[in-house]
Regions:
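A glycine-rich, acidic short-motif signal
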Residues: 1-281
Length: 281
């Protein structure tokens, strides 16, 4: 049986992962794909939540994280992701798990809640930013996490609700193609995202005008989420969770070495250009 999840307190120091996870580096039987997360309050309190069917299990945690990533509300962080930062810049996003307590008792006029309804639930309200081993005070919202997944090409499909003709409309957005490149334009570093998505709405949209309207709304939502997380992570917190530094090192290795001690400053000046195409079906 493999170790499936490691949960930390928010005050954890992750600046020396080789020491913190020495047991994993030495033990070939430890699965490097183990999920990492932070507890909203304390890891001990989270792991000791009592259920009528027993104590909270690792399967509960991994399922919550996997579904969170699939639904575009958080960013996955595995042990191998952290270990890869041992000799590289450490910019990480990590799910924060909290306990959602059941609502208060019903009034006498209501039926009593079932045992399952009274169970505490695990939920992901936000995603932490970790920079050089420190968990920052700024967190990613669900929209930010979605933008990060689209920007890095890790989003497969995503369900969202957009306002269409004055009414809410459910939309399923699936990735069709993705590319992220870094260019030097007259001394300006520009990160170019080219993204094509397929959108399927809950309404039967057949005419071209309506299709174009929905496509424009989906494109606007994606641009807002992507630009929002770029500004929050890279500009406001100097935390490159998009691996732009890898693009910089690969394409401009000499400049990377030259500015290695000023990498945060360089990355904080990179501009983002988005080219998003949406096709509605």
């Amino acid at each position: 049986v493999h170790l499936q999840i490691i949960c930390f307190n928010k005050n954890i120091d992750l600046s020396s992962p080789e020491e913190l996870f020495s047991f994993a580096i030495k033990d070939k039987n430890v699965f490097l794909g183990v999920e990492l997360c932070l507890a909203e309050n304390t890891a001990e309190g989270l792991m000791n939540v009592q259920l009528t069917r027993g104590t909270m299990s690792s399967e509960n945690f991994t399922q919550v994280i996997k579904m969170g990533v699939k639904n575009g509300i958080t960013v996955e962080c595995r042990l191998i992701d952290l270990l890869s930062c041992i000799r590289s810049p450490q910019y990480i996003a990590m799910p924060v798990i909290s306990i959602k307590q059941p609502l208060g008792d019903f009034a006498e006029s209501h039926e009593e809640k079932s045992a399952e309804q009274q169970e505490p639930l695990l939920e992901i309200k936000k995603t932490a930013l970790i920079r050089k081993g420190t968990v920052l005070e700024s967190y990613l919202s669900h929209a930010d996490a979605s933008g990060c997944l689209w920007l890095t090409g890790k989003a497969e499909q995503y369900y969202d609700m957009i306002e269409y003709n004055g009414s809410p409309m459910d939309v399923r957005i699936a990735s069709d193609s993705h590319s992220l490149k870094l260019d030097n334009e007259n001394g300006r570093l520009v990160c170019r995202l080219k993204l094509t998505v397929l959108a399927h709405s809950s309404l039967d949209i057949r005419d071209e005008k309506s299709s174009d309207q929905v496509a424009a709304l989906v494109k606007q939502r994606l641009e807002e989420n992507i630009t929002g997380v770029w500004n929050k992570a890279l500009y406001e917190n100097r935390t490159d969770i998009f691996d732009v530094w890898r693009l910089f090192r690969h394409k401009y290795p000499q400049s990377y070495l030259k500015y290695a001690d000023r990498l945060d400053e360089v990355l904080g000046s990179v501009e983002l250009e988005t080219d998003i195409t949406c096709r509605v079906s």
